Amino acid sequence: LTKDVILNWKDKVYIFKNKSEFVVFYLKEAGYDLSRILYNSLATPFLTTMNLPNSGQDVLFWQEPITDSVPGNMRLLLESNHRQTKIVVQDYTAYTNLLKLVSPEQASRVAFLGFMYPFARQNNFQNQALILTNSDQIEHLESIVSEVPTMHYHVGAITEMSSRLMDLAKYSNVSLYPNITTEQVKRLYKEADFYLDINHQNEILSATRAAFENNLLILAFTNTSHGPEYTAPSNIFSPMNAGQFKQTLKEALGNRDFLSHLLDRQREHAHVATPEDYKKVIG
C-alpha cells in the first residue's frame, strides 16, 4: 500500500505522493486566494502551506499543550521565511511556556487569543443553585444545604438516585430530579445563577461548560472540580475549608456587586475573547 492519492479530473489522471500535494492542487485549481491561510494543525495543513508560493501571511491557531519543548514543525515555522506565519496560542499556559522557549524575535510572531463563547444569558442574581451528578458522593452537600438555607438547591441526575440522595428531600430548599430530562436541564440552566461543581466521579452533560456559558457562578472543591478552565482559582476550595466555600456562597447571595465581581473574575480566568480581540490579533 502506498499513500498516493489518485485523482481522475478533466480526462486526466493525477497522482499525488501525499494528501498535502493533493490539497495544494485542489486549492490552486479552485482559484482561491492563497495569500493568507488560517489553520490549526501542524500536520497536513502545515505541509500544505509549505508547498504554497512564498508570498503569504498565514496564521496557525495552536490549541494543544506546550511544556518543555517547541513542536518540531512549529520550530520550522519560526525559523523559516517561506511564508510569514503568526502563531496564535489559545491556551494561556501553553502561551507562556512557548514564550520561554523561543527567541525575542520569534516571540514577536507569537500571540495569545482566548475563545469567544456563545453566552446564552446574563446572571439574574437569584438564589438558585444547580448540581448535576450521577454519584451520591457530593462534597459537603448536606452541610451546605443546612448552613446556607437561603439558597435553593436543584440536584439532577440522568439515572435513578440512591436513598442517600433521595433523603435530601427532607429539606424544603432542595429539589431532586432523578432521571432528569433534557428539557429540565435546559430550564434549570435558565433559572439557576450558581453552579456547585461538588460531585465526585465523572462530570455529566458537560455541566461546567454549560454553566459557564449561562453565566452561572461556579464554585468547586479541589477534589471535585471538573472544569478548572471555567472556574476562577479563588472559587475552588480545599474540602478542609468548606467554611470558606459556604461564606463565599453567603456573600455572593447577599451582595450583587460581590457576585458581579466573582463573575468578572471567572470570565477573566477563562480568557474570554471578543470579536475586537480577534480583529486586533489576526486583522
Regions found by a protein language model. Name each.
Residues 115-170, 179-182:
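Conserved catalytic-core segment of nucleotide-activated headgroup transferases in glycan assembly
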Residues 1-56, 238, 272:
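N-terminal pre-catalytic "stem/leader" segment of glycosyltransferase-like enzymes
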Residues 70-109:
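A short, active-site helix/loop in glycosyltransferases that binds the activated sugar's phosphate group
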Residues 217-222:
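Short hydrophobic beta-strand element within catalytic cores of glycosyltransferases
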Residues 181-192, 213:
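Short acidic alpha-helix that forms the nucleotide-activated donor recognition element
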Residues 190-203:
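Acidic donor-binding loop of glycosyltransferase active sites
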Residues 240, 253-283:
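A charged, aromatic-enriched C-terminal amphipathic alpha-helix characteristic of glycosyltransferases
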